[in-house]
Amino acid sequence: MATKKTTKAAPKGDDRQKALDAALALIEKDFGKGAVMRLGDENRPPIQVISSGNTALDIALGIGGFPRGRIVEVYGPESSGKTTVALHAIAQAQKAGGIAAFIDAEHALDPDYARKLGVDTDALLVSQPDTGEQALEIADMLVRSGAIDILVIDSVAALTPKAEIEGEMGDSHVGLQARLMSQALRKMTGALYNSGTTAIFINQLREKIGVMFGSPETTTGGKALKFYASVRIDVRRIQTLKDGQDAIGNRTRAKIVKNKVSPPFKIAEFDIIYGEGISRESSIIDLAVDNGIVKKSGSWFTYEGDQLGQGKEKARLFLKETPELADEIEEKIFRKLGVGKFAQTADELTDDPVELIPNVDFDDEDDDFDASTAPAGTFTEVTTEN
């Protein structure tokens, strides 16, 4: 007669807990304390952020700025303001006492323009690498030092593999840059989290050939960055600002197409003034009027009974000359919208229903989404621009 196969019974009750405690002790011995932990054991602080220097973008990001220890991708067409957004973040990090690094793979950083945006160029670490491998190796070493608060790589498209640089014109190097990015991001992600460094990758757009439906636009460097990025921002120039016949800047729209730290698909619109960068005061005025903090009567802007100026430009200049007032109005905006340090905690949340209407073009991010399968009432009708 064949012998019956017996299996060892799983430990029960206290025995299971003892077995788990023994396993955890062994793991901590081999890999260090904190290698495994219960999620509820540690009172984790809110996600730390680096302000973008732009009130509208801080609000769209949902947490008051770029998350620390995460990867951020900023992409868009040429001359849309991508580098300007990154330089403003560097300026804010430096103002808070942080150390910033800029990997200038495009060899196009303008120190004079950076200074006008508030960047301390004397303290800014800059590298102009020869190859993509060198750029990413330098970035990885800086992150692992634990001393860098913000790292900007400009741009992914300019991270040219060594084999391509040393090869002949016309040689095929299919997928080489994508493999390079995938390997680098696998190495850097954990180091970024441990060091609290924010890494901003600036990327360019390309067009896929033969696309019949949906957007033909895609970003360079393969798909790895799309997966590893906690935040992806699409930056577009939507309008030229003029003073009479002279162009003085651009109206820019930034759409948060991916956000792992807050609800995505929010949109921020702001002004970029030539030679000055993003106008923080202009964003404050727009948001304050929208939220009833600043009153607009005709062309006059009024705050708590005091006139800020006639016309938006004069009100903007007044706030620029009185930064304390601008800070006060900005704080009231953040408080009203519950952004950053004013975000509601679990104890403050209510059961009142909240209606969200995402500003999203469904052709932009997820081509496999089928709206017909969504529950009734999931979406409201939105009007998109041509």
From Swiss-Prot:
CDD domains: RecA
Alphabetized Gene3D superfamilies for the sequence: P-loop containing nucleotide triphosphate hydrolases
Statement: the UniProt record of this protein carries the keyword Cytoplasm: yes
Molecular functions per Gene Ontology: ATP binding; ATP hydrolysis activity; ATP-dependent DNA damage sensor activity; damaged DNA binding; single-stranded DNA binding
Gene Ontology terms: biological process: DNA recombination; DNA repair; SOS response
InterPro entries, alphabetized: AAA+_ATPase (IPR003593), DNA_recomb/repair_RecA (IPR013765), DNA_recomb/repair_RecA_CS (IPR020584), P-loop_NTPase (IPR027417), RecA-like_C (IPR049261), RecA-like_N (IPR049428), RecA_ATP-bd (IPR020588), RecA_C_sf (IPR023400)
Gene Ontology cellular component terms for the protein in this record: cytosol
Keywords: ATP-binding, Cytoplasm, DNA damage, DNA recombination, DNA repair, DNA-binding, Nucleotide-binding, SOS response
Keyword Ribonucleoprotein tagged: no
Compartments reported by the entry: Cytoplasm
A Pfam family hit: RecA_C
SMART domains found in the cross-reference section: AAA
Residues involved in ATP binding: G76, P77, E78, S79, S80, G81, K82, T83
Domain of life: Bacteria
Region (Disordered): 362-386
Functional description taken from the UniProt entry: Can catalyze the hydrolysis of ATP in the presence of single-stranded DNA, the ATP-dependent uptake of single-stranded DNA by duplex DNA, and the ATP-dependent hybridization of homologous single-stranded DNAs. It interacts with LexA causing its activation and leading to its autocatalytic cleavage.
Family named by the database record: Belongs to the RecA family.
Protein name: Protein RecA
Organism: Corynebacterium efficiens (strain DSM 44549 / YS-314 / AJ 12310 / JCM 11189 / NBRC 100395)
Gene responsible for this protein: recA
